[in-house]
Amino acid sequence: MTKFIAFSEEDHAILASYFPIADGIAALLGEQCEIVLHSLEFLENSAIYVVNGQNSDRKIGSPLTDHALHSLHHMRTDSVSQPYFIRTANGEPLMKSVTIAIRNSKQHVIGFLCLNMNLNVPAAQFLRK
């Protein structure tokens, strides 16, 4: 495994502090909202926390997507990406996504919080849960 960035204990603690945020977003928005927390320490298996991964079959240890890799340059100055649409490798489901940069005390990007909303879920199901 190749390190992308050397992380401090503080960096690890900052990323861990996002676990309950991911859980809270999922509790509010339901099973159709996938939340993936990525650490930029190891890009090959950057996903360190996944909620509702059944939407894209992502799990802990999954790598950054190509879109997230391309976002690295823009996230040096921006904190939140523009919303974008993606599909999984098999073409389903259609998801609307946003990527949020996570910074350490030196303002270096150390991770991403990616929110992916499954748009194939009927509105009635979204409102019911």
PLM region spans:
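Juxtadomain coupling helices with adjacent low-complexity linkers
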Residues: T2-L28, G111-F112, M117-K129
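Structured interaction and signal-relay segments at domain junctions
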Residues: A22-Y84, T88-N90
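Short linear functional motifs in flexible/disordered or boundary regions
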Residues: L37, A47, V109-I110, L127
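Sensory/regulatory domains in signal-transduction proteins
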Residues: P63, H67-Q125
